[in-house]
Amino acid sequence: MATEVIATEGEAIYAWMIWILPFIAALIIPAVGKFSKISTGRIAVGFAAMSAISAAVLLPMALDGHEIHDQIDWISAIGLKAGVLADPLSIIMANVVGWISFLIMCYSTGYMKGDRDIVRFWFWMMFFIGSMQLIVLSDNLLQLFFGWEGVGLASYALISFWYRDKAKAHVGKEGRSALGIMEYYSPTHSGMKAFIMTKVGDVMMLAGMFMIFAFAGTFGFKELLADTTWAVNMSAESLLVPAAVLLFGGAIGKSAQFPLNEWLLEAMTGPTAVSALIHAATMVKAGVFLVARLGPLFFALGAAGILADQFFEIIAWVGAITALLLATQGMVNPEIKNCLLYTSD
């Protein structure tokens, strides 16, 4: 069980910097790009490295089973605070995201060399990394949702990065179809499809969040866990399971689980570095992280013990169906890049 510790000022700053640094880079890059496009890549790699190092500094704390919980006033009128929750789960995930993202950024300096829109590429890549780290380190559902939407917006911009829709940027084979549906997609089509399909899950997640807030009066993970009266009241009105499933809807969309998995293949229209960032490192892992973050909460609801079984049975069935579908699709897909994609989900 993680133990909350009184963090030193330096430790708390490291926790904040993990997600703030990529956003700072995203703000700087467009201005610098007006004078030197080459420098934008160096800025992106440098800030990605600093974010990853900030996460690594907190690893000893995670290995000791401790955590940092630091808050600042956000919306004082309603008593809402913004905060970071750096516990073993979030610290380990922040390191996974940070270091894989750093390696992808290093690779991108060569892969994207000479691209006419390189400044826009670096901006959205850093915005994406910052949004994902915000998801990982948020101490409440509302703040997490801002990062959630940031990841969705950045993924749309990156999947459709080559928006001029030249033939070489398409995914699939021209003329190939399955069940009468063409399997040849342009970047703009793919980006829009990913954006719309993930928004279905986002709306479900938002509904689940506010259902819980209506009973609990808070979005904070620690506050929800400390006093479970809200869960007893929701369970009495048969609303606890629907709220949990709605929250899981967000994970279904972001992690491309059945039935919202059809955007996944078409997302390969983005640059290879984008595909690596979305599929291998971050975006499809956001749903997994959300379930992991909420897991202890639902296990702790002793007054509604049946819920944990029902909730996790639904997760297991959705995951099993998705794995079967994507495995069979991967077996018959002629493109090696797409076969690798199906193994990432």
Where are these regions (language model features)?
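Transmembrane helix-loop-helix hairpins at membrane boundaries of multipass inner-membrane proteins
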Residues: 1-16, 27-123, 218-234, 293-295, ...
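Hydrophobic alpha-helical membrane-embedded or membrane-associated segments
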Residues: 21-22, 26, 46, 206, ...
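Hydrophobic alpha-helical transmembrane segments of integral membrane proteins
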Residues: 18-19, 26-27, 255
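Short phosphate-coordinating micro-motif centered on Lys-Gly-acidic
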Residues: 149
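Hydrophobic faces of stable alpha-helices that mediate helix-helix packing
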Residues: 21, 25, 99, 318-321
